[in-house]
Amino acid sequence: MKIQLASSYGFCFGVKRAIKIAEEHQGSKTYGPLIHNKDEINRLKEGFDIGLAEKLDDVTPEDSVVIRTHGIPKDELSQLKAQENPIIDATCPYVTTPQNIVANMSEKGYSIVIFGDKEHPEIKGVVSYAKDLRNAFIVKHEDELKGLPILSKVAVVAQTTRKPEDFLKIVNALILNHKEVRVFNTICNATFENQDAAAELAKDADVMVVIGGKHSSNTKQLHSICKSYCDDSYLIENEAELEPKWFEGKKLCGISAGASTPDWIVQNVIDKIEALK
């Protein structure tokens, strides 16, 4: 069985930047998990004494606080500043872009539509920048737009890790029903590249392994894309989750990895699959 990596996979610019920031601030705490990868979080904890604050009460006066890659709600950032904790912002620049767009367009009187998962930390942060939360709407499907009190002029942004084709469905539905629609494509380039590369490989592979955190939006999107081309597509966090039966009788095993998956985990998975051959 041949093992082939997707032409684009793994750590994106924003995650690489955040990891470097954390490593340079040994002994600090991240506000929320820095990235959606438990193994890498544990590496930072063990090697660099990086702690975790899940809420404001977990932050002590002496803590230096690293803001997670996904960003945090505006009011929580303001409270951290009011507490005068040293703050190191590791929010991905691709995430601050929709934050700024939402702030700017809502100030100009536009309704805000955000395509994404309302429970995802990135989206919780982005929507908090709206001037009036009653005029900001989070949707995952175009059907959810029906009946919403959206104004005649609307600005739309996307969670950075969503599928472009799904974003277009939201945009098309808005254009059909609203006089002025301002579209801001805030999907990250790395997301495009990883998704396209995974799709191309999945077309040829007879088994696909997608590596990444189970709570990682971009990893789940990759798995969904692979599954649409290759029925035997599996999402794992590390090599311990591999099952020998997946590879029985297979000729080509494709591998992709989410944006929060470090190369050392990818290599561990490859080594384990090699051993199973």
UniProtKB/Swiss-Prot annotation:
GO BP, sorted A to Z: dimethylallyl diphosphate biosynthetic process; isopentenyl diphosphate biosynthetic process, methylerythritol 4-phosphate pathway; terpenoid biosynthetic process
Residues the entry annotates as binding (2E)-4-hydroxy-3-methylbut-2-enyl diphosphate: H36, H70, H120, T160, S216, S217, N218, S260
Keyword annotations of the record: 4Fe-4S, Iron, Iron-sulfur, Isoprene biosynthesis, Metal-binding, Oxidoreductase
Residue positions binding [4Fe-4S] cluster: C12, C92, C188
Pathway this chain belongs to: Isoprenoid biosynthesis; dimethylallyl diphosphate biosynthesis; dimethylallyl diphosphate from (2E)-4-hydroxy-3-methylbutenyl diphosphate: step 1/1; Isoprenoid biosynthesis; isopentenyl diphosphate biosynthesis via DXP pathway; isopentenyl diphosphate from 1-deoxy-D-xylulose 5-phosphate: step 6/6
Enzyme Commission code: 1.17.7.4
Listed Gene3D superfamilies: 3.40.50.11270, 4-hydroxy-3-methylbut-2-enyl diphosphate reductase, catalytic domain (3.40.1010.20)
Binding site for isopentenyl diphosphate: H36, H70, H120, S216, S217, N218, S260
Catalytic residues, chain numbering: E122
CDD domains, sorted: lytB_ispH (cd13944)
Domain of life: Bacteria
Any GO molecular function: 4-hydroxy-3-methylbut-2-enyl diphosphate reductase activity
Record Pfam families: LYTB (PF02401)
Cofactor note: Binds 1 [4Fe-4S] cluster per subunit.
Cofactor names: [4Fe-4S] cluster
Residues the record lists as binding dimethylallyl diphosphate: H36, H70, H120, S216, S217, N218, S260
Catalytically driven reaction(s): isopentenyl diphosphate + 2 oxidized [2Fe-2S]-[ferredoxin] + H2O = (2E)-4-hydroxy-3-methylbut-2-enyl diphosphate + 2 reduced [2Fe-2S]-[ferredoxin] + 2 H(+); dimethylallyl diphosphate + 2 oxidized [2Fe-2S]-[ferredoxin] + H2O = (2E)-4-hydroxy-3-methylbut-2-enyl diphosphate + 2 reduced [2Fe-2S]-[ferredoxin] + 2 H(+)
Biological function: Catalyzes the conversion of 1-hydroxy-2-methyl-2-(E)-butenyl 4-diphosphate (HMBPP) into a mixture of isopentenyl diphosphate (IPP) and dimethylallyl diphosphate (DMAPP). Acts in the terminal step of the DOXP/MEP pathway for isoprenoid precursor biosynthesis.
Family recorded in the similarity comment: Belongs to the IspH family.
HAMAP family to which the protein is assigned, alphabetical: IspH (MF_00191)
The protein's name: 4-hydroxy-3-methylbut-2-enyl diphosphate reductase
Organism of origin: Sulfurovum sp. (strain NBC37-1)
Protein encoded by which gene: ispH
